[in-house]
Regions:
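Alpha-helical interface subdomain recognition
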Residues: 1-222
Length: 222
């Protein structure tokens, strides 16, 4: 049987990257819609999350593509090595991934403090309501990730752990993937309801997009 039918190949080198890229796409499109509607400011943190998740996912996907092709992936003829170089720079220009992590964590840390820990708990409650209506889109698992993030931030507050820069960077990463899990669940719900925007990407049908969202939510919650 071809490699494309072997889980050791697809589930390591293809599926995780396709899923994370779709999460980034969902967050980008959701943020773009919010900007178009106006009234929420520049959404700088959301922009940082969109760039961070999408560029890191693209870089990981390109690296996996080289691995998937074996020796051929490393040669000029197959162009994959060029794709890797091209996508690698996206994690550097217009703000490195580390700057994005710091930008994200600082803003969301302030939101956590201002809301007395309610910022992500409130979002989790909304996702749980969505899960009651459309359990297939993975919103319940995304809600679990949001509650876990809220608890983690509270532990960091009590222990004053954010005095350590490494902790802030790690929080930025966790915030980004957690918020993207919610965006993808909402996108899958809109697809199931048949109300995606006219210009939205439709490479996945509603059932497939729901499956993608569930996989992403479970990976995030872990």
């Amino acid at each position: 049987s071809p490699l494309s039918q072997k889980q050791g190949y697809t589930h390591k080198l293809i599926v995780p990257h396709a899923v994370r890229l779709e999460a980034g796409r969902a967050y980008i499109e959701e943020t773009a819609e919010r900007i178009d509607r106006g009234g929420e400011g520049t959404l700088n943190t959301e922009g940082a999350i969109a760039k961070y998740v999408s560029t890191e996912a693209g870089n990981a996907a390109a690296d996996a593509a080289i691995q998937a092709l074996g020796g051929y992936g490393y040669t000029h003829e197959y162009m994959v090595e060029k794709i890797k170089r091209d996508v690698r720079i996206t994690t550097i220009y217009e703000g490195t991934s580390e700057i994005m992590e710091m930008t994200i964590s600082r803003d969301r840390w302030q939101q956590h403090l201002k809301s007395s820990g309610g910022y992500y708990r409130d979002q989790a409650t909304e996702l749980e309501a969505l899960d009651q209506r459309l359990p297939q889109v993975g919103a319940g698992i995304a809600a679990l990730a949001h509650r876990a993030l809220a608890e983690l931030m509270e532990v960091a507050r009590i222990g004053r752990l954010t005095r350590n820069q490494h902790v802030l960077l790690r929080l930025g990463e966790l915030v980004a993937i957690t918020e993207c899990s919610a965006a993808l669940a909402r996108r899958a719900a809109r697809a199931a309801d048949g109300v995606l925007p006219a210009k939205a990407d439709r490479r996945f049908d509603p059932a497939a997009l729901a499956a993608v969202s569930r996989v992403n939510a479970r990976t995030t919650a872990l």
